[in-house]
């Protein structure tokens, strides 16, 4: 398994309960596919560098995980489909 950092931005209009459910759902996608979540950071609502779908703000979430390729691919696939996630990026951390 490799270390990854995942950052995703949630649409600002999502209610707090739905936002928590979304975060838990995507954490579940990773853990159900064999990933281990090391750290979760909620950056909260921040201004976007540029407009995405006419939106200027979003809720930022950052995850550090140990995962295999299958877990990352499934997360990526579902994040692309979900309309409440504006953008996401997965970065592989280098071995030291």
From Swiss-Prot:
InterPro entries: Ribosomal_bS6, Ribosomal_bS6_CS, Ribosomal_bS6_sf, Ribosomal_S6_plastid/chlpt, Transl_elong_EF1B/ribsomal_bS6. The keyword rRNA-binding applies. Gene3D superfamilies: 3.30.70.60. GO terms for cellular component: cytoplasm; ribonucleoprotein complex; ribosome. It comes from the Bacteria. One of its GO terms (biological process) is translation. It holds the Pfam family Ribosomal_S6. Belongs to the bacterial ribosomal protein bS6 family. Binds together with bS18 to 16S ribosomal RNA. HAMAP family: Ribosomal_bS6. This is Small ribosomal subunit protein bS6. The gene is rpsF.
